[in-house]
UniProtKB/Swiss-Prot annotation:
Its EC number is 2.7.2.15. GO terms for molecular function: acetate kinase activity; ATP binding; propionate kinase activity. This is Propionate kinase. Transmembrane segments: none annotated. One of its GO terms (cellular component) is cytoplasm. InterPro entries: Ac/propionate_kinase (IPR004372), Aliphatic_acid_kin_short-chain (IPR000890), Aliphatic_acid_kinase_CS (IPR023865), ATPase_NBD (IPR043129), Propionate_kinase_PduW (IPR024896). It comes from Klebsiella pneumoniae (strain 342). The keyword Cytoplasm applies. Belongs to the acetokinase family. PduW subfamily. PANTHER family: ACETATE KINASE (PTHR21060), ACETATE KINASE-RELATED (PTHR21060:SF15). Signal peptide: none annotated. Keywords: ATP-binding, Cytoplasm, Kinase, Nucleotide-binding, Transferase.
């Protein structure tokens, strides 16, 4: 038996979606509605056979959801909306409450909205997306899949900041971690490809895109991760600084009179690859500039790799060794240069790359005599979301989900 599951990612001015046939994971359609609220919004929808694109005014997310659902039947992808068996929603922040994906009910929604203080840019619109789909598909079960949930297995030594206790107890300031759905998916996919239980592996997963995070996975559980209270922390990213000396911030307030908003803009939108290179936040553009002799671009690439290498090294120490290293995300999946720079001179760990395999982004790119497996795995958060819908919302499908 097959089930049609929708995976939804609602952003502040966008709506990304996939419709999958489960448990096989076959993609029926995918698309994006962007620039919501503007007179020239764009709606893109594609199947394996066709692609549609339209520019039109879309006033709000309510219109976007209506447009999407009408297109599914209007384009013949579904004969009826009753064919949809479940909907999964990506939610940025689950706080300490959600240690797993959760069936959507009124209480779940209220908690997602309450947690908006921890993710003010994402949780409110995530909750709005859930409400709108519940209104249009009231009989269809829905599941909220939290980006933070996979990291709720961290020990206190990994998630607690050495601040006065009340800042954690009263304000919830601690490491939460993000990209959890991606790290969970690629580590599970690795174990499947190796034919080894994930519980038997020590893995470091590097999700490298415009946002970057590194995750240590031991015994099938996240034991450390580079992103913390916000997705701004950790390793260097496209426009985000990652970890810096915190005293730089009050120094800038005193020296340049910067406001909290200006500091946030500096750390989140003006730093990282863009800030160091002065060229771009796109790794490919910085690579091109470095190859043309731009010294700051070359330095940006080296700094990017060094921050990741240092994080990987600390996680290897924490886990007492390493069985496999995973690269995923736009940079991790497509940049042979990034992978080679991060993995250079690590023979003493039993980690070495095969240059030819790395250049063609093979699934496994380690040298033949290397002890540590190095894998390039395309992330698929939507498939992970659909699996969570199957597991939690469709009891009759649970056995199929486990075996898939």
């Amino acid at each position: 038996m097959t089930y049609k599951i929708m995976a939804i990612n609602a952003g502040s001015s966008s709506l990304k979606f996939q419709l999958l046939n489960m448990p096989q994971g076959a993609l029926l359609c995918q698309g994006l509605i962007e620039r919501i609220g503007l007179p020239e919004a764009r709606f893109m929808l594609k199947t394996s056979a066709q692609k549609w694109q339209e520019t039109l005014p879309i006033a709000d997310h309510h219109e976007a959801v209506t447009l999407l659902l009408e297109a599914l039947t209007g384009r013949g992808i579904l004969s009826s909306l009753q064919e949809i068996d479940g909907v999964g929603h990506r939610v940025a922040h689950g706080g300490e409450r959600f240690k797993d994906a959760a069936l959507v009910c009124d209480d779940t929604l209220r908690e997602i909205e309450r947690l908006a203080e921890l993710a003010p840019l994402h949780n409110p619109v995530n909750a709005l997306g859930i409400r709108l789909f519940r209104q249009r598909l009231p009989a269809v079960p829905a599941v909220a899949v939290f980006d933070t949930a996979f990291h709720q297995t961290l020990a206190p030594e990994a998630w607690l900041y050495p601040l006065p206790w009340r800042y954690y107890a009263e304000l919830g300031i601690r490491r939460y971690g993000f990209h959890g759905t991606s790290h969970h998916y690629v580590s599970s996919a690795l174990a499947e490809k190796l034919g080894v239980p994930l519980s038997a592996l020590r893995v470091v997963s590097c999700h490298l895109g415009n946002g970057c995070s590194v995750c240590a996975i031991k015994g099938g559980q996240s034991v450390n991760t580079s992103m913390g209270f916000t997705p701004q922390s950790g390793v260097m990213m496209g426009t985000r600084s990652g970890d810096i000396d915190p005293s730089i911030l009050p120094w800038l307030v005193e020296k340049e009179g910067k406001s909290a908003l200006q500091l946030s803009q500096l750390l989140n939108n003006e730093s990282g690859l863009l800030g160091v290179s002065g060229v771009s936040s796109d790794y490919r553009d910085v690579e091109q500039a470095a190859d043309a002799g731009n010294e700051r671009a070359a330095l940006a690439l080296s700094l990017f790799a060094e921050r990741i290498r240092a994080t990987i090294g600390s996680y290897i120490m924490q886990m007492g060794g390493l069985d496999a290293l995973i690269f995923t995300g736009g940079i991790g999946e497509h940049s042979a240069r990034a992978r080679a720079t991060i993995c250079r001179n690590l023979h003493f760990l039993g980690l070495a790359l095969d240059d030819e395999k790395n250049q063609r982004s093979a699934t496994f790119i380690q040298a033949d005599n290397a002890l540590v497996k190095v894998a390039v795995i395309n992330t698929n958060e939507e498939l992970m979301i659909a699996r969570d819908v199957m597991r939690l919302a469709l009891p009759q499908a649970r056995e199929l989900t486990v075996s898939a």
